[in-house]
Structure formats: C-alpha cells, structure tokens
Amino acid sequence: MKKTLAALIVGAFAASAANAAVVYNNEGTNVELGGRLSIIAEQSNSTIKDQKQQHGALRNQSSRFHIKATHNFGDGFYAQGYLETRLVSAQSGTESDNFGHIITKYAYVTLGNKAFGEVKLGRAKTIADGITSAEDKEYGVLNNSKYIPTNGNTVGYTFKGIDGLVLGANYLLAQERYKYGGAAGGAGGAGAVAGEVYPQKISNGVQVGAKYDANNIIAGIAYGRTNYRESIHEKDLGKKQQVNGALSTLGYRFSDLGLLVSLDSGYAKTKNYKDKHEKSYFVSPGFQYELMEDTNFYGNFKYERNSVDQGKKEREQAVLFGIDHKLHKQVLTYIEGAYARTRTNDKSKAEKTEKEKSVGVGLRVYF
C-alpha cells in the first residue's frame, strides 16, 4: 500500500532518531550515539569571467557523529547535553576529499519541560534553520544564512506545546574573537585587541520565528536583526554593520497524491558603513513527490536579486532536481543536480554573467 508523503516525512524524522544507538538507559538517564558516513561523486562546471572550469571529485559529504545525553527529573522536566561533529578538509595541505579534520559543529545544553518549552545554550541551530521547506541533499540553492543566521553561539527558547506548532526566539552572541593582541592577532592584527570580535563577524543578534506543520498545511515565518563588528582600526567604506532579514514559507500536502508544493521567500536590508545600503530578496517555488515507496523526487527554482541604490545589481536564477531512494532503513542513495546563472550589472561596466552546474551521486550509511 502506498504511503502518504506526510507519513514519509514523519517516518524520516523517526528513522533519524531510530538510527541512534542507546548505550545507556537507567534511572531516568538516556545516552545515545549516532551519525552517518556520506560519500558523493560529483562533476562540476563553472564559467567565471569568461573562464571555464571543470572538475570531478569523490569526497565526504557532511559525514557526522553525535552523542546526546538526556536526564529526566520527573514532572516533565529534563536536561540534555548534545555534541555533534563534522569531518572537513585540513586547513593545511592539499587534500580535497574533506576527510582531514574533525570539528565541532554543535555543542549545547538544554533545560526544558514538555509543557512549557525549553531553553538552549551553546553552539546550536536557531529558529531560522527550519523555516524554509525546500529539499536538497548537497547543492541547495537557498542561502538562508545570508538573510538570518541559522546557527551560532546562542541562547534560545523553543515552545512545542501545541500540536504542529513551533515557536522560537534566539539571541546570538559573538563566536569569533581575537585570541591574541598586536601583530599576532591575525587579519587586521596590527591593532588587534585580545578578546575583541573579528571584523565583519557577528557581534550580536536577535531573531524570532514560528512554524506550523499540521493538517496538510505548512506555514512559517522568521525575522532577525544581526549586528556585525566593524574594524576599530580601519574604517573601510562599504563594510556591513547590520542586516535586517526575514524568511517565510507556505506549503500544502496533497496526501492522496504523495505531493508537497511550497513557496519559500526571503528579504534582507544590509546597512553598510558610510555607504549605500543593499537590499536582497528571493522567491523559490518547490515540490516533493513520492514516486514509489521509499523513492522520492524533489526540486525547486530560485530567483534572487541583490541591489544597491543607483549602483550594482545582481540577479541569480537557479534550479535544482534530485531523486533519493532508501535501500534500507539506514542506507540512502541519491542523485542530485543544480544549475545557477548570475548576471551582474554596474553602470560603469559591461554586464557580467557567471554560470555554475553541478551533479552528484551520493550514498549515506547511518549508524
């Protein structure tokens, strides 16, 4: 019997939780280990400044490992610690397979109650991370973090007490600071002060959001204001000071057809230091369709525009399609491709066009 798309999506979340192995469970304490190894073989082509480039690769695709410890106090109260790593290329050396180093992606603690919500502190996802509905495995054409940061060093509150509704708010703190002063400070280090935030990195920010996903309806919206550190020694014109951004999604599931259609969008206004402000927006219709049991077809299109008053204008059109298939409850294979074209217009220069095409075949093994 054919499953509905809603059941598949719920099943996907359940499967991701089931992939974790419970290594300890006693007296209200539960410890889980899990993760995945993911490999992709890809071919990419790009045209930048009329120069064509082409390369193929076999590389790691966001392989990860996580550990989660949950302690239940009773009466619905709990505390949780979570650590998730990523495999990435070494900072030094020439390896490009992304298997060089292990880094910390998320690390946070949570205090919560099933009825009243939870407070999360540490390096974690924000409410903006789950707002849009577009599906992708590797070549996602949406750049949500350009509009609102989707993760960082944060204090966050999330409420899930109403079925299908998630409410959240996050306060972002600086995550990248000079470790040393003087010339040892690195970029801009001549006048660096130990402990100061790196120029053009997040200084602080706030965001709020809500998402509803029930009764075949998906609706979500998030707003964020993010402040960026200016160099206290070099007053460069055009450096961003603040970004006010919004993200939204609206979708509907045709359960009998196994089809989800959605429309994602975003808007941002960037305030630059003693320079003209920049405005950005995008719209992105998309779909997810169940071809057969354990096989899904998905895609989305994006139109994005960045503009400066009486200045440079940039337009990007991008499209993505993919098919994934579950060989086993813990084995997923997929093929995905994306194409993007960017046109840049400046009053004093000729129009510039850049193109990029990518296609990849991937395999994920969960544990």
Swiss-Prot record:
Bilayer topology: Multi-pass membrane protein
Q: Name one GO molecular function term.
A: porin activity
Pfam families per record: Porin_4 (PF13609)
Q: Which residues form the signal peptide?
A: 1-20
Gene3D superfamilies in the record = Porin
Keyword field = Cell outer membrane, Ion transport, Membrane, Porin, Signal, Transmembrane, Transmembrane beta strand, Transport
Report the domain of life of the source organism.
Bacteria
Under the heading InterPro entries, the entry gives: Gram-neg_bact_OMP, Gram_neg_porin_domain, Porin_dom_sf
What's a BP term from Gene Ontology annotated to this protein?
monoatomic ion transport
Q: Where in the cell is it found?
A: Cell outer membrane
The protein's assembly and partners: Homotrimer.
Task: Provide the function of this protein.
Answer: Forms pores that allow passive diffusion of small molecules across the outer membrane.
User: Record's PANTHER family?
Assistant: OUTER MEMBRANE PORIN F-RELATED, PROTEIN YDDL-RELATED
Family to which the UniProt record says this protein belongs = Belongs to the Gram-negative porin family.
This chain's protein is named: Outer membrane protein P2
Per the UniProt record, the source organism is Haemophilus influenzae
